Amino acid sequence: VIQLHDKHFVPFINAVQINEAIARMARQVENDMGDEIPVFIGVLNGAFMVVSDFVKQYKKPCEVSFVKLSSYEGTSTTNSVKQLIGLNDSLKGRTVVIIEDIIDTGNTIVALKEMFDGQEVKQLKIATLFLKPEAYKKDIKLDYVGFEIPNKFIVGYGLDYDGLGRNIPEIYQLQ
């Protein structure tokens, strides 16, 4: 059991399981891309570890960029997505793969899809290491999912609770 601020968390998914899921997702994306050189777009802050490990596993040419949006305060989703940092390069005619750490309500994905719809991308794919199917009620297709998890708050591997826990190499769940 670990404590972050006022909450206690118990082990949930270990580092080996995370690495296996990311490797599996990287193979799936490689197979789907053919000769395309995708632009992987990580969603900060949470996805920095996922993106780092994903691109190390991805064996074909690719580009990497990041966007930063936020919809979390504490342990609850705020339902309002604020764009903080956008993209500088044109993505017109490119294949874009959004890499998320976690998708629960899907509000961030809706905001990102709207951003990319205006960019005239060739195709948009969505990858997430963690999906909370109970919370996800959007119509946007998720192309690559590492784990489906219960609708409980998790920390570690880039995910935080009010700033703490991102550096933990495995996933812990709220007790």
Which residues does each PLM region occupy?
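PRPP-associated nucleotide enzymes
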Residues: 1-175
